[in-house]
């Protein structure tokens, strides 16, 4: 696959072609996913749950994120690598910069930070210093204790209004991409149309500029046995993992995934 850059992703949004993203934590799956055509590999702090067996992402450290980023880099075949800043790794803008530098040196092309408009100062500082940022809004797993669990965000009109305003504010602060998780499909569509940067969705309907799933979920692997509504098992009917990865890419590109059954209403 030709090397994917931010320019590539902006071009895909401009021409209306969907962007494909999957989580990835090691060299073998990095090679498999990138060779299947997945454009963005997300080294997610979800590794705390799917690899380490924790019940949340909170125990994951920056050092662990750097380790897995370096592993993904070694297997990657042209995809853009996006790495999460883990819990409390961006408590201050300067701390965010120091930890982002660690992740970029390990092989990340961009970092992802969970939050809302209060992130503007941090995003501005990172962007000014050459660190591209993806802002993660909606259901933010690092604040699951404040949110009261893994619940859809933005169903109330006041909350939806605030999310729209926050998305615009973060773009103006320098965010290069947005990720919306567990947001009503209509709201996700409005935010996607309101900003000029790529918007990736998970449980946010089909109108976003692209889709992401946790690798283990889309391969039918689950420690807990609980499968989120927005997940589809792409291993079903496929002879091997490569075919499942290709099927995911094709489904996103053809907008046959996600279907209405994978999204949420207001």
Curated annotation (Swiss-Prot):
Q: Respond yes or no to whether keyword Metal-binding is given for this record.
A: yes
Give the residues annotated as active site. 181 (proton acceptor)
Q: Name one Pfam family in it.
A: Pantoate_transf
Q: Which cofactors must be present for this protein to function?
A: Mg(2+)
Q: Which GO terms describe its cellular component?
A: cytoplasm
Q: Which UniProt keywords apply?
A: Cytoplasm, Magnesium, Metal-binding, Pantothenate biosynthesis, Transferase
Q: Could you give the cofactor binding note from the entry?
A: Binds 1 Mg(2+) ion per subunit.
The UniProt record lists the keyword Membrane: no
- Give the pathway annotation: Cofactor biosynthesis; (R)-pantothenate biosynthesis; (R)-pantoate from 3-methyl-2-oxobutanoate: step 1/2
Q: Where does 3-methyl-2-oxobutanoate bind?
A: 45-46, 84, 112
Q: Which reaction does it catalyse?
A: 3-methyl-2-oxobutanoate + (6R)-5,10-methylene-5,6,7,8-tetrahydrofolate + H2O = 2-dehydropantoate + (6S)-5,6,7,8-tetrahydrofolate
User: Which GO MF terms does the UniProt record name?
Assistant: 3-methyl-2-oxobutanoate hydroxymethyltransferase activity; magnesium ion binding
Q: Which CDD domains match?
A: KPHMT-like (cd06557)
- Gene3D superfamilies per record: Phosphoenolpyruvate-binding domains
Enzyme Commission numbers on file: 2.1.2.11
Q: Where in the cell is it found?
A: Cytoplasm
Listed binding positions for Mg(2+) are 45, 84, 114
Q: Which InterPro entries does the annotation name?
A: Pantoate_hydroxy_MeTrfase, Pyrv/PenolPyrv_kinase-like_dom, Pyrv_kinase-like_dom_sf
What GO terms in the biological process aspect are recorded for it?
A: pantothenate biosynthetic process
NCBIfam families per record: panB, PRK00311.1
User: What is annotated about its quaternary structure and interactions?
Assistant: Homodecamer; pentamer of dimers.
Task: Tell me which family the UniProt entry assigns to this protein.
Answer: Belongs to the PanB family.
What function is annotated for this protein?
Catalyzes the reversible reaction in which hydroxymethyl group from 5,10-methylenetetrahydrofolate is transferred onto alpha-ketoisovalerate to form ketopantoate.
Q: What name appears for this protein in its UniProt entry?
A: 3-methyl-2-oxobutanoate hydroxymethyltransferase
Species name: Pseudomonas putida (strain ATCC 47054 / DSM 6125 / CFBP 8728 / NCIMB 11950 / KT2440)
**GN (gene name):** panB
């Amino acid at each position: 696959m030709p090397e994917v850059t931010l320019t590539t992703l902006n071009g895909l949004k401009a021409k209306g072609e969907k962007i494909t993203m999957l989580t990835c934590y090691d060299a073998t799956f990095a090679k498999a996913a990138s060779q299947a055509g997945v454009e963005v590999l997300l080294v997610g702090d979800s590794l705390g749950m799917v690899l380490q067996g924790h019940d949340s992402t909170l125990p994951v450290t920056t050092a662990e994120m750097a380790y897995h980023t370096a592993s993904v880099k070694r297997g990657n075949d042209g995809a853009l690598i996006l790495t999460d800043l883990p819990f409390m790794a961006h408590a201050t803008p300067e701390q965010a910069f120091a930890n982002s530098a660690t992740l970029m040196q390990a092989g990340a092309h961009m970092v992802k930070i969970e939050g809302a408009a209060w992130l503007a100062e941090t995003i501005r500082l990172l962007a000014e210093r050459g660190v591209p940022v993806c802002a993660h809004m909606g259901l933010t797993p690092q604040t699951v204790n404040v949110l009261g669990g893994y619940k859809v965000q933005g169903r109330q009109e006041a909350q939806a209004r605030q999310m729209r305003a926050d998305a615009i504010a973060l773009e103006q602060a320098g965010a290069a991409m947005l990720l919306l998780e567990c947001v009503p499909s209509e709201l996700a569509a409005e935010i996607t149309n309101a900003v000029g940067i790529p918007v990736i969705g998970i449980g946010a309907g089909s109108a976003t500029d692209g889709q992401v799933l946790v690798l283990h979920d889309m391969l039918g692997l689950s420690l807990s046995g609980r499968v989120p509504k927005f997940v589809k098992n792409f291993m079903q009917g496929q002879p091997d993992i490569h075919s499942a990865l290709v099927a995911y890419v094709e489904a996103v590109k053809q907008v046959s995934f996600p279907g209405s059954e994978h999204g949420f209403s207001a």
